[in-house]
């Protein structure tokens, strides 16, 4: 993860996701927080979203609100919409005030995705309760 070539660092991040497991999250979160290259951080945010563990939420929240790159904030917001949670929704509501339009648009999409998942979940529960 400390290789001088950003392409190698990006691939290493993606490979960690391929190996899977929640124990990989701290390594990817460190890349998201500390890598100098915004493309590498963007891929780390994407990767955390793909993993969909609740433990990915804190680093994604931090990046959505604080990363200096609009490119990374946008991807972290989208990833929060994939993972979903009360905390994710609160953060995405804050991201609606981001100065960069792509981040705001990503927050809108992410919130819509969370709402859809919540509706789907409620429908599944209703179907189970009613035998439908």
Positions of the model-derived regions?
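Amphipathic alpha-helical scaffolding segments comprising HEAT/armadillo-like alpha-solenoid repeats
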Residues: 2, 21-33, 53-65, 85-97, ...
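Short inter-helical turns and helix N-cap capping residues of alpha-solenoid HEAT/ARM repeat scaffolds
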Residues: 4-5, 36-37, 68-69, 99-100
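Structural detector for internal amphipathic alpha-helices that build alpha-solenoid repeat scaffolds
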Residues: 6-21, 30, 39-53, 62, ...
């Amino acid at each position: 993860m400390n290789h001088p070539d950003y392409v190698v660092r990006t691939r290493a991040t993606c490979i960690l996701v391929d190996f899977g497991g929640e124990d990989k999250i701290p390594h990817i979160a460190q890349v998201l927080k500390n890598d100098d290259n915004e493309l590498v951080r963007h891929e780390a945010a994407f990767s955390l979203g793909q993993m969909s563990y609740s433990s990915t939420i804190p680093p994604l929240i931090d990046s959505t609100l604080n990363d200096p790159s609009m490119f990374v904030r946008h991807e972290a917001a989208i990833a929060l919409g994939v993972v979903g949670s009360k905390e994710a929704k609160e953060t995405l509501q804050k991201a609606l005030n981001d100065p960069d339009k792509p981040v705001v648009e990503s927050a809108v999409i992410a919130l819509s995705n969370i709402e859809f998942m919540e509706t789907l979940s409620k429908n599944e529960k209703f179907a189970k309760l009613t035998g439908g």
